């Protein structure tokens, strides 16, 4: 987890150069989670999507801060000890209808769109045999969130 958080911190630093320090990254995760094992680049595509889809030029012109949060926690889910990583933002969000369409797209064949999200979903499904390893939600015009759930495993040294 620690390595993945470093990747997204660096990515957000780059985006701050691009947008002039108008983005904020918040991370909330217990230090005990830092040694948890996660697939490589499981979070960065979600943060990239937040910038690409959630950040409206209008917000930048109105001098609003674009905020992205990553929250990690260990939680039991269906009798499994799991790691939940949630990436959410205060961007423009999507409608309930479009959110449902996006959920349906996860299981469809590649059409060249939603590559990052579909890739994360399929990797979790293949690696952990979890059909519900990715959950998508939106508060219409007040942001978007993606929850990634995988079995909790400590890094072995």
How should each PLM-predicted stretch be described?
Residues 1-137, 144-149:
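Two-component histidine phosphotransfer core
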């Amino acid at each position: 987890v620690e390595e993945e958080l470093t990747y997204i911190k660096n990515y957000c630093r780059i985006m701050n150069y691009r947008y002039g320090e108008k983005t904020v990254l918040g991370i909330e995760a217990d230090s005990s989670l830092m040694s948890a094992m996660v697939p490589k680049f499981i979070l960065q595509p979600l943060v990239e999507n937040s910038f690409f889809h959630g950040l409206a030029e209008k917000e930048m012109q109105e001098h609003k801060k674009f905020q992205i949060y990553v929250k990690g926690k260990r939680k039991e889910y269906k009798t499994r000890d799991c790691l939940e990583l949630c990436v959410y933002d205060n961007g423009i969000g999507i409608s309930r209808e479009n959110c449902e369409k996006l959920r349906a797209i996860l299981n469809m064949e590649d059409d060249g769109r939603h590559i990052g999200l579909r890739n994360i979903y399929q990797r979790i499904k293949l690696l952990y045999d979890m059909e519900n390893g990715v959950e998508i939600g939106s508060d219409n015009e007040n942001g978007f969130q993606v929850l990634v759930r995988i079995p909790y495993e400590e890094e072995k040294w």
